[in-house]
Amino acid sequence: MAKAKFERSKPHVNVGTIGHVDHGKTTLTAAISHVLAKTYGGEAKDFSQIDNAPEERERGITINTSHIEYDTPSRHYAHVDCPGHADYVKNMITGAAQMDGAILVVASTDGPMPQTREHILLSRQVGVPFIIVFMNKCDMVDDAELLELVEMEVRELLSEYDFPGDDLPVIQGSALKALEGEPEWEAKILELAAALDSYIPEPERDIDKPFLMPIEDVFSISGRGTVVTGRVERGIVRVGDEVEIVGIRTTTKTTCTGVEMFRKLLDEGRAGENCGILLRGTKRDDVERGQVLSKPGSINPHTTFESEVYVLSKEEGGRHTPFFKGYRPQFYFRTTDVTGTIELPEGVEMVMPGDNIKMVVTLICPIAMDEGLRFAIREGGRTVGAGVVAKIIA
């Protein structure tokens, strides 16, 4: 069977559904798929296809996730939905499914519930930039005042976590009724799609961001100088550009005097490409794996940060026993392990395998980092946790 050609002409945006268990996330995902396919063309996915989420492994962590695609007239969306709460936690922390925006589903029959709050907090910690609210099951609430009350509660909760609760779009609808084809509720799904189009800005492409390449290997080529190799994470580097070597040691500046890929010389290296970069006047011993090459001033080295961490369960190959404060594992950033110590939140004595927890990490040497950077926690080369930098402290 021929694969459909990937449509690149429209901007591509990644979204997903979040919210409390049984509030209708998967039903809404199916409703969006159906209503948009019916209105704008495309393939409709059934509830059962989405609910039966395939198992994926991201950094050794088992996550069940459903990916569907749909189109509006102006955009192409990739949408992720998870069956269980634990899957959301893992997904958001590992960045397995990066979201440019999230649809928070709240059943108007219940209002905000504990996981509603937890998903909003996680969105804040892992850097989901925009949230749109879909109040579901509105067909089951006769009282307009009650709907208003729930909307107010949700807006206040979002404001509590520094999302613009007063200004973000809230759509009142019924995913099930829309899925059953009732026109007044289908219209609400189109309203939601229009909100996605207008409220979530087009994401900046990796290639338009400032240049950054994690250094994987260093060679010296006699008569030419030092070459560092790696995969360009973002941006473009051109021959003649000034670059910085950041992390582990004192930051130094140098110039890119050559870019090569598959033994061919190029004028530039772009996001996603594996290349070798020749550095002017840099000695082989001045650079090491674990540092990054970047556009000057675009990223700084840090040692202390607040993070959101998921600790692998025993079944996932993680630890069999809890850990306590003073735990000193390795933190794996991009290409290297750095030892660090942890500080647990007040009142938390120990962390069990399978938990997710906020912790402050202090590394023994600085690493180039931005908020939103993912890392793994390892003991002797074995992954025991996954985390994301939520806030840089020092």
Curated annotation (Swiss-Prot):
GTP binds at residues 19-26, 81-85, 136-139. Residues 10-204 form the tr-type G domain. The keyword Nucleotide-binding applies. Its EC number is 3.6.5.3. GO terms for molecular function: GTP binding; GTPase activity; guanosine tetraphosphate binding; translation elongation factor activity. Residues 60-64 are annotated as: G2. It catalyses: GTP + H2O = GDP + phosphate + H(+). This is Elongation factor Tu 2.
